Amino acid sequence: MNLDFAKSDGLVTAVIQDHASGRVLMVGYMNQEAFNKTVETGFATFWSRSRKKLWLKGESSGHRLVVKEISTDCDLDAVLVKVEAQGPGVCHEGYESCFFRRLDAGEWKVADNPTYDPGAVYGGKS
C-alpha cells in the first residue's frame, strides 16, 4: 500500500499536529521526495508550491519539527504527522500554530499571543 500522490498534482496534504498537546500546528504539502526525506531524516520536510522546491521546516529559523508518528487517511492522499517542535513556534508570523485566528461574529480575530519575534528570526521578512 502506497500514498496516492497522483490525485493532487503529485502532492499529499500534510496536517502537522503537536504530539503532546494534540494542537494542529500547520498544514503543508508533500510530494514523494519530501515524504521520503521526512521518513529518512525524522524532520518534517515539505514541497513548497510557491518556490517549487523542497523545504525543510525550520531550515532558516531553527524551529524544526521532529517527527514522532505518521498516519494516513482512508484514501491514502493525506498524512497526519505528529511532531515535537524544536522552538517556540511553527508559524512564520510568530505564533505557536499557524491557526492563531478565529472567526468571531463574522470577523477573523487573533486569538493567541505571539511566542517569538519573527523579525529577529527571519531578519525582518515574514
UniProtKB/Swiss-Prot annotation:
Note whether rRNA processing occurs among the keywords.
no
Instruction: Indicate where this protein resides in the cell.
Output: Cytoplasm
Give the EC number(s) listed in the UniProt record.
3.5.4.19
Q: Which reaction does it catalyse?
A: 1-(5-phospho-beta-D-ribosyl)-5'-AMP + H2O = 1-(5-phospho-beta-D-ribosyl)-5-[(5-phospho-beta-D-ribosylamino)methylideneamino]imidazole-4-carboxamide
Q: Which EC class heads this enzyme's classification?
A: hydrolase
A single Gene Ontology biological process assigned to it is: L-histidine biosynthetic process
Instruction: Explain the purpose of this protein.
Output: Catalyzes the hydrolysis of the adenine ring of phosphoribosyl-AMP.
Q: How does it assemble?
A: Homodimer.
According to UniProt, the name of this protein is: Phosphoribosyl-AMP cyclohydrolase
Record the organism: Solibacter usitatus (strain Ellin6076)
